[in-house]
Amino acid sequence: MIVTTSPNIEGKQIIEYKKIVFGEVITGVNFMKDIGAGLRNFFGGRSQGYEDELINAREEAIREMEQRAKDIGANAVIGVDIDYEVLGADNGMLMVTASGTAVVIEAQDY
């Protein structure tokens, strides 16, 4: 399945626009990562634990969006947007949302 931020797919004709599809992931950030991130913030540097969590959440949101597109008969998602939000009383939760337009493009070998 082609997933792109572009509003079209070069060289492919969109045959049908299905609907907007979403993938949402909410994940908690654990205490040990918080301690490590705090030290890195103090001394400067990157928090690999947080970065890994962010990457995993983003990839899962995209997979979920793709699956929802497949479920309605689409073979591509265009105009993809990914949003991030910090939630919770202690800002201890991360929400990642992927959204796009599910479409059917002309026959392909993907």
Curated annotation (Swiss-Prot):
InterPro entries: UPF0145_dom_sf, UPF0145_YbjQ-like. SUPFAM superfamilies: YbjQ-like. Disulfide bonds: none annotated. Belongs to the UPF0145 family. HAMAP family: UPF0145 (MF_00338). This is UPF0145 protein lmo0208. It comes from Listeria monocytogenes serovar 1/2a (strain ATCC BAA-679 / EGD-e).
